[in-house]
Design a protein with these regions (language model features):
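Glycine/proline-enriched, intrinsically flexible loops and inter-domain linkers
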Residues: 1-170
Length: 170
């Protein structure tokens, strides 16, 4: 979940929240075919303001589109529409949690395992859902084949932070 993106565009924020949770689980060795999502949503009090009503609608549409694009469905969630106190409002918030059942032999962790291991950055050709799904499929295949010893998804943190965390480990 990226609060800065969600404040600017609730649709994009929710879409990216789903993408990030799916990518993290793929990087951990789980397959999208076995994944499910659950959401936690927080929004300002809607009152009678049509613009306020549009924020949760946009977020839900973004999350729905991501589910369709990545073939992963949500099985539940919890929402709060009372995220306001006097003049303070929470940013539009849709947090996505991904879970899956998988084979323990496929589970990977992000820390680098040994000196001399090859480090590879895999990136999508573009931001189209088909390109993202092809990248997920390739990662699922490489992890299943035992080629990947460590794997991490960079998400909003960026590549540099992800590499430092992989190098430092637990």
């Amino acid at each position: 979940f990226n609060p800065y993106l969600s404040a600017l565009d609730p649709y994009a924020g929710a879409y990216m929240a789903v993408l990030d949770s799916v990518a993290k689980l793929v990087a951990t060795g789980f397959e999208r075919a076995n994944m499910y999502l659950t959401f936690q949503e927080y929004f300002e009090k809607l009152r009678q303001d049509p613009e306020r009503w549009g924020k949760p609608m946009a977020a839900v549409l973004g999350a729905l589109m991501a589910q369709v694009d990545f073939g992963v469905g949500a099985i539940g969630g919890k929402d709060s529409m009372s995220g306001s106190f006097e003049d303070l409002d929470v940013p539009p918030t849709l947090v996505s949690f991904a879970t899956a059942i998988g084979n323990i032999d496929r589970v990977t962790s992000p820390e680098l395992k040994a000196a001399g291991d090859n480090l590879v950055w895999i990136s999508c050709q573009d931001t189209l859902a088909s390109s993202l799904c092809a990248t997920f499929d390739a990662m699922e295949h490489l992890i299943g084949a035992g080629v990947v010893r460590a794997c991490a998804s960079s998400g909003a943190a960026g590549l540099a932070e992800t590499l430092v965390k992989m190098a430092v480990g637990n």
